[in-house]
């Protein structure tokens, strides 16, 4: 699994570096690259490749999808780390973008990464049917704005030190994390003509995203900052509404196992073609950073 992740990281980073190299250079490109590279494990990109394998989608198309997703993800991390949000100093084992370059520069770098995602998907060299292209841009827009990441982050901040129901926490985590995972699982399907698979993989993606968020919360609960590459135990200090704070550590693990079983049951009909996707899901649960 580690070799497959490294391969994904290298391929996506190469695409993004080449894409940026062809653009007119600006002073803002330095903090943009700082927030984007080397990046994390590229789990979202790996899911795109995994689902692409199920439906036999060419890698050259998957690279556009994954690069756009990583731009969105990096933008969200830069903004999440800001003092007015989660106020973090360390991300991916190094200073957060605002600590390195200042708050205003970090905001602008994050904004630029958000728009870069749309630039990549609308690029004429991403040579797909225009209706499919519009569907992808529409979907990633929903995943990033008030119906997705931004809306989820708003709720995350708003729920601090409050009693919140399990369903509200789940809805918040699906917005904050699950929607972009849903795009990762759904976008390769959109490139095919298998419309009957769209709803199914949208739900699978949301569930994987929820699984990822639970795993992330478990890392915050039990790991060290050195291992995780970011501050840990910050959720409890800030009174964050998480499934761990609501259900307890053991019950959160049980809920994650239930989710995994549901996802695996949904993949039964795809045989060996879904083996990479299942392996990635197992990795999401077992990771320590």
Where are these regions (language model features)?
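C-terminal end-of-chain micro-motif
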Residues: 1, 288-289
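N-terminal amphipathic/basic leader segments beginning at the initiator methionine
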Residues: 1-20
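Mg2+-dependent prenyl diphosphate-binding active-site environment of isoprenoid biosynthetic enzymes
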Residues: 17-268, 272-288
